Amino acid sequence: MKKENNYISTDMNHKKLIFGVVIIHVCFMLIGASGILSGLKEKNIFYGVLINMIYQLTLIIMIGVAMKQYLITSFKKFKADRISVNIKRVLAGVGIAFLLSYIVRIIEMTMCSNISVSANQSNVNGYFVDYPILAVIMSVIMGPFTEEIIYRGILFRFFSKYGELCAVLSTGFLFGTMHMLFSFGNTNILLFLCQWLDYFLSGILLGFIYKKYKNIWINVSIHGTWNLIVAVIILTQI
């Protein structure tokens, strides 16, 4: 199998489709930031869930077609490692993510007088109240898969031509910024920066994990496990 910078190569016959995945993701996030989705959600939250499901399924289908061999080869490498090894990697990743999030929360409580969740997280919480099963599927399975493919499987490998550290920082910045688009203009600057820092550090962590293991399924597993923990916390508070 041909290698590119030690990463499993993607079939470049589908360059346009891969580019389309990134464009659809960016457009969806920008539309969400514009308030259109919030308006539909206020009329009926099911519209928000439906649009999110269609968006995620569209990306998954496009990714499956464009990056089939990449996903299969990566999964074979992932499965070749002992289960105990992969579990340790996932637990280590989740543990570091928890530590980073805890540090950011301390900074947030120190610097901000009014603390609230980000608009992105608020939208997710709303889905859990009315459609918990669909919310779990979107946040624990679909979201981690599509986000890791976009930010690590595609964008990280694109920026890695300028160096792996550049790839880690660039994708971390984009990951943090995209998750905060919904909050632009809706919160004070200090709170915004603290919430952005939380997502940014998560993106940096996931970037270093991909740099270390060079396997997208490890990233998906860690991202999905973290979201599962968050989902359980949300569901227990409803």
Listing of model-derived features with the role each one plays in the protein:
Residues 1-12:
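Short, Lys/Arg-rich, polar N-terminal cytosolic tail immediately upstream
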Residues 28-52, 109-112, 183-191, 232-238:
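Juxtamembrane/transmembrane-helix boundary motifs at the membrane-water interface
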Residues 14-30, 92-97, 170-174:
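Alpha-helical transmembrane segments
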Residues 102-105, 130-238:
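Transmembrane helix-loop-helix hairpins at the membrane interface
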